[in-house]
Design a protein with these regions (language model features):
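Flexible, low-complexity inter-domain linkers and amphipathic docking helices that mediate domain-domain
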Residues: 1-7, 504-505, 511-513, 518-525, ...
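N-lobe entry segment of adenylate-forming
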Residues: 1-62, 135, 140, 601, ...
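Conserved AMP-binding/adenylation subdomain of ANL enzymes
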Residues: 194-211, 218-263, 278-283
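Conserved ATP-binding/catalytic segment of the ANL
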Residues: 374-384, 390-399, 403-465
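AMP-binding/adenylate-forming catalytic core of the ANL superfamily
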Residues: 121, 258, 265, 408, ...
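Conserved AMP-binding/adenylate-forming core of the ANL superfamily
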Residues: 31-85, 102-110, 162-164, 185-194
Length: 709
């Protein structure tokens, strides 16, 4: 199904670009692959690459029919690029997918293999031996013919001819998010791909004189299209390393930029944070990042503080603030939708948080709560963005949040073999407007501010409590800032319906590896207090899990719906769990209260701490006398019950606002005993979340878990 945004067809294909580079005597294009120490492992020029591609294309001609899907299952290596381009050369459909590192991830490979209908798979980088084990456990994988690219005959006489293809035909299938058992493949046409790369080239100033440096996984759209294919389109050299090499030693990425005078690079937010945290001063010595023209930041969420910290750390080594280029994109629109201009510092917008929760864009002014959002740049040339009410399909006013709809030549053909979902997602028209443009519904929420797209969340992720909208990212960040044992960007907040029919908040949160055996009670307390203090809402359940247990897409985006299902199914690797034990404790607490005689200040102090400890299901040690009871997790219902229980205990009627009028245990005791109230204590400020910092296993998990990019 087409989106009615017909791409330009005069750009050729990526295979014809390769052929032109191979024939040019002055071509600068080459790919240099670095090993885990930063040494050159392999280098290949355009002519050699074209010869290798033609050899594999000839093999595909002998093994399959034009238009057939071909699985590409590779460890990071140059042979992946050879195989992908061989599919383009021969008119086959490339289906890139990462090889599973662990047995539990084979299901993803099986699902993609079955959904794509591939009968042939190309492998490389040591995957051939692994594939034999996978086939032993899977009838689906046994039905596929597996071939290592290294074993294919390179005799020029066997080389395949460059096929002429319809620019509107499918070029490759990019599998996106969904549960691991039901992946969705986006059909990207040759014209889609070439149009997106032409727009990115114009937006970010790529040319044959540029140099790309990338560690991004090639099975994912950002690493595949921007990291590799864009260099062929623009004719510039690329320096590549494996994701594992970066994760083990993040400064290796920066060293490669410095050494090869990289001009363009891209990474999710966590990578910049990882460099800031992991690159010791002695490792930074000698770095020169002044050659960089742009460093794309394309992960969601884009955290302004991460960019500020990176500039503060690496500004002394030539990195400029205006080098950062936040962007927004998705596989359904090939890759990029927006672009921040080159040599212009990113825009950050400080907004009224309460208004944003209500779907309104209001500058902070004197707002009690504020939130800072990064602009993701303006729409690429020829790309149209509309902010639409997802319920009515009508365009939203400029100061309102709505669903992001995208139109233009980069919008993909649809979902592979899913006409129903394609019809509901692609080629949609805005209600009440006479417009020939058919839009892509992204499922993302956002608004245009000062000409830039600002992404605020996902439609399905919204949590509605008492009529107010809450973004899970806000809850996750507030929680992760509360305690050093919690992994930043390692949590998933989602709404569930409680036994009483009301929406409740559940937070699944990863612990740092070194904190797994500690006492979880202070962590539960810190999370509850921070979320209350920051957002004035309660978390009903907190689930602490192993590092890497939170489900993510291949680009690191939290899959909140998948985590909710995993929590319900009991399949998460849980370390400890806390729940606000309301009904279970209410009766016991009331009985305890009735049995306790009133007393002096010290007795009242003890009684109040015990009552709150039981009611909130928190350890007694957390009932600090100068800590706000709201921070502890006391709700308005709890406050009314507390007033009644205290009144019964001391033998006098208290107003239902007792806990709000006297918000600490000290203040309550002072009021009840008749002594002067304790001076108010300013609430503690939680530590700022530094961004998307994760250790090796968590990042490897991110790379393995495929899904929406």
């Amino acid at each position: 199904m087409h989106s009615r945004n017909e791409p330009a067809v005069g750009l050729g294909t990526i295979a014809t670009r390769l052929a032109a580079l191979a024939a040019a005597s002055d071509s600068r294009w080459s790919i240099t692959f670095l090993d885990s120490h930063g040494a050159v492992f392999e280098r290949c020029g355009a002519a050699e690459l074209a010869a290798r591609v033609a050899a594999v294309a000839g093999f595909l001609d002998r093994q399959s029919a034009p238009g057939a899907p071909v699985l590409l299952v590779f460890q990071p290596c140059v042979d992946f690029l050879v195989a992908f381009l061989a599919c383009q050369w021969s008119g086959r459909l490339a289906v890139p997918i990462n090889p599973p590192r662990r047995h539990r991830l084979i299901q993803r490979l099986q699902s993609v293999a079955a959904d794509s209908g591939a009968a042939l798979a190309l492998t490389g980088g040591g995957v051939a031996e692994q594939s034999a084990r996978w086939q032993a456990d899977s009838a689906v994988l046994r039905a596929i013919r597996w071939h290592d690219v290294a074993d294919i005959d390179t005799d020029p006489a066997q080389a395949g001819l460059l096929h002429e293809v319809d620019p509107g035909a499918t070029c490759f299938i990019q599998y996106t998010s969904g549960s691991t058992s039901l992946p969705k493949g986006v059909e990207v046409s040759h014209a889609n791909l070439m149009a997106d790369m032409a727009l990115m080239e114009a937006a970010w100033g790529l040319s044959p004189s540029s140099t790309m440096v990338t560690w991004l996984p090639a099975f994912h759209d950002l690493g595949l299209i921007f990291g590799l294919l864009q260099t062929l389109f623009s004719g510039c050299p690329v320096v590549q390393m494996a994701p594992n090499s970066f994760l083990q030693r993040p400064v290796l990425w920066l060293e490669a930029i410095s050494r090869f005078r990289g001009t363009h690079t891209a990474a999710p937010s966590f990578a910049y944070d990882l460099c800031t945290r992991r690159a010791a001063p002695e490792q930074r010595e000698g770095l020169d990042l002044s050659s960089l023209v742009m460093a794309m930041n394309a992960a969601e969420p884009i955290v302004p503080r991460v960019m500020e910290n990176f500039v503060d750390t690496f500004g002394a080594y030539g990195f400029r603030r205006e080098t950062f280029a936040p962007a927004y994109g998705l596989a359904e629109s090939t890759l990029a939708v927006t672009a921040s201009p080159v040599a212009v510092a990113p825009k950050f917008f400080t907004l009224d948080a309460a208004a944003l929760e209500d779907g309104r864009i209001v500058p902070e002014s004197a707002a009690a709560r504020r939130t800072v959002i990064a602009g993701c740049g303006a729409p690429l040339a020829d790309v149209t963005i509309a902010i639409v009410d997802p319920a009515t399909g009508r365009r939203r006013p400029p100061d309102r949040v709505g669903e992001i709809w995208v139109g233009g030549p980069t919008v993909a053909r649809g979902y592979w073999r899913r006409p129903g979902e394609s019809f509901a997602t692609f080629g949609i028209h805005i209600a009440g407007e006479d417009d020939s443009i058919g839009y892509l519904r992204t499922g993302d929420l956002g608004a245009m501010i000062d000409g830039e797209l600002c992404v605020t969340g996902r439609i399905k992720d919204l949590i509605i409590l008492s009529g107010a909208n809450h973004y899970p990212q806000d809850i996750e960040r507030a929680a992760q800032a509360a305690h050093p044992a919690l992994r930043v960007d390692g949590g998933a907040a989602f709404g569930v319906v409680g036994d009483d029919g009301t929406e409740q908040v559940v937070l699944v949160q990863e612990l740092e590896r070194t904190q797994r055996r500690g006492d979880p009670a202070p962590i539960f307390s810190a999370i509850s207090a921070a979320v209350w203090q920051t957002l004035e809402l309660q978390v009903s359940r907190i689930v602490l899990v192993e590092p890497g247990a939170v489900l993510r897409t291949s680009s690191g985006k939290i899959q909140r719906a998948a985590n909710r299902e995993a929590w319900r199914d009991g399949t998460l690797a849980v370390i400890a769990e806390w729940r606000m034990a309301r009904d279970a404790t209410r009766e016991a607490v009331s009985a305890t209260a009735a049995s306790q005689p009133p007393g002096d200040a010290s007795t009242l102090d003890r009684w109040l701490r015990e009552w709150l400890s039981r009611r909130l299901d928190l350890p007694l040690s957390d009932m600090l006398v100068d800590r706000g009871v709201g921070e502890l997790g006391l709700t308005s219902v709890d406050a009314v019950d507390l007033a009644g229980a205290v009144g019964a205990h001391v033998g006098r009627k208290l107003p239902q606002t007792f806990a709000f009028d006297h918000p600490t245990i000290n203040a309550m005791v002072a009021h009840l005993s008749g002594s002067a109230p304790a001076p108010p204590v300013a609430p503690a400020t939680p530590r700022l979340a530094p961004g998307s910092g994760e250790d090796l296993e968590q990042l490897l998990s991110m790379i393995e878990e495929d899904g929406r990019g």
